[in-house]
UniProtKB/Swiss-Prot annotation:
UniProt GO BP: L-proline biosynthetic process
Keyword Amino-acid biosynthesis attributed: yes
UniProt binding sites for ATP: K15, T174, D175, T216, G217, G218, M219, A220, T221, K222
Name by which UniProt lists this protein: Glutamate 5-kinase
PUA domain segment(s): 281-359
Binding site for substrate: S55, D142, N154
HAMAP family: ProB
Pathway annotation: Amino-acid biosynthesis; L-proline biosynthesis; L-glutamate 5-semialdehyde from L-glutamate: step 1/2
InterPro entries: AceGlu_kinase-like_sf, Asp/Glu/Uridylate_kinase, G5K_ProB, Glu/AcGlu_kinase, Glu_5kinase, Glu_5kinase/COase_Synthase, Glutamate_5-kinase_CS, PUA
Chain's gene name: proB
Family as reported in the entry's similarity comment: Belongs to the glutamate 5-kinase family.
Gene Ontology MF terms in the entry: ATP binding; glutamate 5-kinase activity; RNA binding
Subcellular location: Cytoplasm
Cellular component, GO annotation: cytosol
């Protein structure tokens, strides 16, 4: 199955974690980087295009600056990222050069992907670079980003990049063999799970949540990334990044790591952007009847189904849609501001103009701008 699945894939996103790129002292491991670049060069010779999402800038900068511990303040993280990113790019440039490949640095923030125009510009840039045979190396722009607009980690970023790049496969390279039934570092009975078809709450619980002293993402963030990629119809494979020839091994269809297969029902690219690239500005709490209609019938959200609104936002903002239990089940672009929704909650659509003195339409969120998660 794996051989047939991977044979058809022409564009791959490869995400490399900090623990893969660095040695035990936290310095860049040029031997590992060289081997990975050699593997990627082999994919290029097969006619496949590769987009690299690389962690390691802060770790590399920390080593260059002589920091003995992971930086904790934002200025220290950004200083480490500033010096580390140049070191990372130099390492990739030197490692790809013997294979006749050039690299390009692409630094993104969440705001870049939240704007539909900038999102499409990023897609066009990646298409152009790949057309020239260049390897784009993507990282979050840690030097300028603030906590409120961070992607969170590069696992999340790599899942979003699969949509930007219109890729057919996401490869996440980490420091363990793949996804286990429990944490193998603390549970000797943990077993490797070779295939996951549908990410359930049990799978998410088994993933845990802790990261490392070098990177920011644990297995939980990798499973979350696989879930987002699956919603885009893209399979994800988590593999041991330091193993020699690992990319060639997995692309040959051999059973290595953990393969997450996409869901049967996936989102179109615009709705995937809406669900995962935008940062929600508030919450709309709806009654059980509205929740049922949105989940099972794919209808628009009417004011009559709204119980209350939380947060302050303007018309056109992305908002979470939650049931009466306050659990999020959908996201969408609101046709009305939070103050307007507060006045319209529980009312019939026919009364919108009487209440506000104007109307933008009959719905709070149109079904075309609503995504069930």
């Amino acid at each position: 199955m794996r051989r047939e699945l991977f044979r058809k894939i022409k564009r791959v996103v490869v995400k490399i974690g900090s623990r893969v790129l660095t040695d035990d002292e936290g310095a860049l491991d040029m031997g590992v980087i060289g081997r990975i670049c050699g593997d990627i060069a082999s994919l290029r010779r097969q006619g496949r295009q590769v987009v690299l999402v690389s962690s390691g800038a802060i770790a590399a900068g920390r080593s260059e600056l002589g920091m003995t511990e992971k930086p904790r303040t934002i200025p220290h993280k950004q200083a480490a990222a500033a010096i580390g990113q140049t070191r990372m790019m130099r390492a990739y440039e030197e490692s790809f050069a013997p294979h006749g490949l050039k690299v390009a640095q692409v630094l993104l923030t969440r705001e870049d992907l939240a704007s539909r125009q900038r999102f499409l510009n990023a897609r066009a840039t990646l298409d152009a670079l790949l057309g020239f045979g260049v390897i784009p190396v993507i990282n979050e722009n840690d030097t300028v980003v603030v906590e409120e607009i961070k992607f969170g980690d590069n696992d999340n970023l790599s899942a979003l990049v699969t949509n930007v790049a219109e890729a057919g496969l996401l490869v996440i390279m980490t420091d363990i063999e793949g996804f286990y039934s429990a944490d193998p570092r603390s549970n000797p009975d943990a077993v490797l799970v070779p295939l996951v078809q549908g990410i359930t709450r049990e799978i998410e619980r088994a993933a845990g949540g802790s990261g490392s002293s070098v990177g920011t993402g644990g297995m939980a963030t990798k499973v979350a990334a696989a879930k987002k990629a699956a919603k885009n119809g893209v399979p994800t494979i988590i593999v041991p990044g330091k193993r020699e020839g690992i990319i060639a091994t997995l692309m040959a269809g051999q059973e290595v790591g953990t393969l997450f297969l996409p869901l049967d029902a996936c989102l179109n690219r615009r709705k995937h952007w809406l669900a995962y690239s935008l940062k929600p500005a508030g919450r709309i709490i709806v009654d059980d009847g509205a929740r049922e209609v949105l989940l099972k019938k794919g209808k628009s959200l009417l004011p009559s189904g709204v119980l209350r609104v939380e947060g302050r936002f303007e018309r056109g903002a992305c908002v979470r849609v939650c049931g009466s239990d306050e659990q999020e089940f959908a996201r969408g672009l609101s046709d009305y501001s939070s103050s307007e929704i507060a006045r319209l909650a529980g009312q019939r659509s026919s009364r919108i103009e009487a209440i506000l003195g104007y109307r933008y339409g009959d719905v709070i969120i149109h079904r075309d701008n609503l995504v069930v998660l």
